[in-house]
Design a protein with these regions (language model features):
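N-terminal flexible/basic segments that precede or flank functional cores
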Residues: 1-28, 97-154
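Helix-turn-helix/winged-helix DNA-binding modules
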Residues: 28, 39, 67-70
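DNA major-groove recognition helix of helix-turn-helix/homeodomain DNA-binding modules
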Residues: 72-88
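Amphipathic, hydrophobic secondary-structure cores in small proteins
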Residues: 62-67, 73-77, 93-94
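Short C-terminal boundary/hinge segments that cap the last helix of small helical domains
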Residues: 83-99
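Short basic helix-loop element that most often maps to the first helix and adjoining turn
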Residues: 3-4, 31-50
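Recognition helix of helix-turn-helix/homeodomain-like DNA-binding domains
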Residues: 51-69
Length: 154
């Protein structure tokens, strides 16, 4: 195993750990700023004073967050004003290996079926079980080698 694979494995561990830690977490419908503020029993005016902004700015922030129209800096400032910390992550729905396996299978299926179409033109089609075996074999090889074009296409 090369250095590149070791480093990739370390990154996978970090992402898998974050995915596990956030598995049951969902963004509240009102957004985190309003939810935490209400949990603390803090008024919008009080948060505005702590953030050194207007009440209107807090209202705007609380309406923008659920729509995804807020900056990380604004969330950070609100979190600090409420005595909290901002945590953000991009995590897959499951393990990183699952994403890699799924991509390898899609890519392998496209490659094997394209080859099958060419073979059919020469009247040399494979049985469905042989096609499945070829897809599985190709997917394993793609997941292992992860060529430069791995994430391109299917």
């Amino acid at each position: 195993m090369g250095v590149k694979q070791v480093v990739q494995g370390q990154y996978q561990t970090i992402v898998d750990r974050a995915a596990g830690a956030t598995a049951g977490l969902a963004v509240p419908s009102e957004g985190w700023v309003r939810t935490v503020r209400k949990a603390l029993g803090m008024s919008g005016a009080q948060l505005a004073r702590r953030m050194q902004v207007t009440r209107g700015a807090v209202n705007q922030l609380e309406h923008a967050e659920p729509n995804g129209a807020v900056t990380l800096n604004a969330l950070q400032k609100a979190a600090e004003a409420m005595g909290c910390r901002l945590v953000y992550a991009i995590v897959p729905p499951g393990a990183v290996d699952t994403l890699i396996h799924d991509q390898a299978e899609r890519k392998a299926r496209a490659l094997v079926l394209a080859a099958g179409r060419h073979m059919a033109l020469e009247d040399q089609t494979l049985a469905p079980d042989r096609i499945k075996a070829q897809i599985d074999l190709q997917a394993q090889e793609l997941a292992r080698a992860m060529p430069a074009d791995f994430w391109d296409g299917p």
